[in-house]
């Protein structure tokens, strides 16, 4: 059985870095071994792969590969004038992913990880 591939995307790169730090803290706290790959800020564990990809990317490869898309969209942190641009980028991503791909938020992803590694 192949491991699921989760792709995380956010509006701001700062949020992606914060998500990475949070994930590393969770992995370390749960004693989960992982490997980091530099391309797309990628994490690999024994149970899944996570790729962090920018929302405004010309490279749709991370989205085509994913079995679950993690959208981290905090509209309160962007100017109202940029809403259409964000919506357009999200729609493009949703057209790139496989029709079976689940779309979740980062809180749901954290619950999935916790459940995966419960003893």
Where are these regions (language model features)?
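Amphipathic alpha-helical segments
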Residues: 15-30
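Conserved ATPase-coupling elements of RecA-like P-loop NTPase cores
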Residues: 78-82
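SF2 helicase catalytic motif II
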Residues: 69-74
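Inter-Walker segment of RecA-like/P-loop motor cores
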Residues: 30-44, 52
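Intrinsically disordered, low-complexity regulatory regions enriched in serine/threonine/proline
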Residues: 86-119
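Conserved RecA-like ASCE ATPase "motif II neighborhood" in helicase/translocase motors
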Residues: 51-67
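GIY-YIG nuclease signature motif recognition
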Residues: 1
């Amino acid at each position: 059985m192949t491991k699921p591939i989760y792709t995380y995307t956010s509006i701001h790169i700062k949020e992606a870095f914060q998500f990475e730090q949070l994930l590393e803290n969770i992995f370390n706290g749960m004693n989960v071994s992982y490997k980091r790959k530099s391309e797309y800020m990628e994490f690999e564990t024994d149970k899944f792969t996570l790729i962090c990809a920018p929302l405004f990317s010309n490279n749709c490869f991370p989205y085509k590969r994913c079995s679950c898309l993690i959208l981290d969209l905090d509209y309160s942190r962007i100017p109202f004038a940029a809403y259409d641009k964000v919506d357009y980028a999200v729609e493009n991503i949703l057209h790139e992913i496989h029709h079976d791909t689940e779309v979740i938020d980062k809180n749901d992803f954290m619950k999935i990880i916790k459940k995966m590694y419960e003893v």
